[in-house]
Every structure is written in C-alpha cells, then in structure tokens.
UniProtKB/Swiss-Prot annotation:
Functional summary from the UniProt entry: Required for biogenesis/assembly of DMSO reductase, but not for the interaction of the DmsA signal peptide with the Tat system. May be part of a chaperone cascade complex that facilitates a folding-maturation pathway for the substrate protein.
Family: Belongs to the TorD/DmsD family. DmsD subfamily.
Originating organism: Salmonella typhimurium (strain LT2 / SGSC1412 / ATCC 700720)
Keywords, sorted A to Z: Chaperone
One GO term of the biological process aspect: protein maturation
Protein name: Tat proofreading chaperone DmsD
Length: 204
C-alpha cells in the first residue's frame, strides 16, 4: 500500500487545496484557509521542503489591485471564457465540453465503487477541486486503493496541464501561488504513487 496516502498530511493537504479551488474565498469553507495562507505558520505544516515553499508563501502575500473575490469570479465562474477551466473533460475531450466521456467514465468508476459525492448544483464531478476533496475523503475513510485509482486514472492525466495554464493566466498573486502550491504538492504525490498514471491525450 502506498504509505503517503495513509499519512494524515495527505488528507489535510488534499482537503485544503480542494476547498481553495472549489469554493469562493469568502465562503465559510475557505475564508479561514485564505487567512492561514496569508501568514507564515502554514509552511511548517505543509509536507514540502521549506526552500520550495518560501517563494510560494511570499507570493500569497503579494498585493493586487484586483480583489480575491473578483479574481475567483474571473477564474472559476465567468461570465467570460475561463482562462483554465477546472473540469477534466474540457482537457480530455476532443470537443473540450463539460460532461464529456471522461466525466462519464468517472461516474461509472464511482458507481462501481459505491462512491457518492455531493456536488454543488448541476456540476460535473470532474472539477479539479472536487476531485481533491474526494481524494481526501477516500483517504480519511481508509479507501486507499480507490484513492490511488482516482488520482492515477481521473486526476493526474490532465492536472499538470491544467495547473500550468492556470498559473500562467491566474492574473492574481494569490491564485498564482495556489496553482504553484498545487503543482508542487501533486508532483510529490505522483512521484510516490505505486500504480501507473493513465496516459490520455489532451486537447487543450
């Protein structure tokens, strides 16, 4: 069994990252996390090298004329085209659509494994943030095999490309730092994964 999935820090970091990508920065789920990242205490608790985290921590605290809620709206809601859409099927489907074949494959996998996960409104299950929250839930419930499959089959095949584009187009230091923190953290997870990551073509 992959030991990193059994550590408490995996579930904690997956839940923190998932919430910050999924919920508004003003929400009750996320507002305390935003404040924590604006201080320096979090670095000692994050399972990455302090030297790698230092520039990320500095960027979190960099001032921007655009407010955090405005940046959230622009990056995740619209009304204009999102610079880096957070749904897997946008990257994995030839037509770059929501609810694409990869979303249906994720739903089938969830049904086969008896996994039910509540989404906000009528939203695809393959949102980057919601997949991280699901990974945290699986780890917390000792379903490490399913957690490995979720990461290797349904998240890692597209997450690196999503994060690269997200960082390049974030346009706000907080979300640029969040993208970098996610990229560093997921790279460490992937390096420790036992089962191979599925190779899937990307269309963005």
């Amino acid at each position: 069994m992959t030991t990193f999935l059994q550590r408490d820090d995996f579930a904690v970091t997956a839940r923190v990252l998932g919430a910050l990508f999924y919920y508004s920065p003003e929400s009750h789920e996320t507002a305390p996390l935003v404040q924590a990242l604006l201080n320096d205490d979090w670095q000692a608790q994050w399972p990455l090298d302090a030297e790698a985290l230092a520039p990320v921590a500095a960027m979190f605290k960099t001032h921007s004329e655009e407010s955090l809620p405005q940046a959230w709206q622009r990056l995740f809601i619209g009304p204009y085209a999102l610079p880096s859409p957070p749904w897997g099927s946008v990257w994995l489907d030839r037509e770059s659509v929501l609810f694409g074949d990869s979303t249906l494959a994720l739903r089938q996998w969830m049904r086969e494994n008896g996994i039910q996960f509540e989404m906000q409104q009528n939203e695809p299950e393959d949102h980057f943030g919601s997949l991280l929250l699901l990974a945290a839930w699986l780890a917390e419930n000792d379903r490490h095999h399913e957690c490995e499959q979720l990461l290797a089959w349904h998240l890692f095949p597209w997450s690196s490309r999503f994060l690269d584009v997200f960082i390049d187009h974030a346009g706000h230091p907080f979300y640029q730092a969040l993208g970098q923190l996610a990229r560093l953290t997921l790279a460490q997870w992937q390096a420790q994964l036992i089962i191979p990551v599925a190779v899937k073509p990307l269309f963005r």
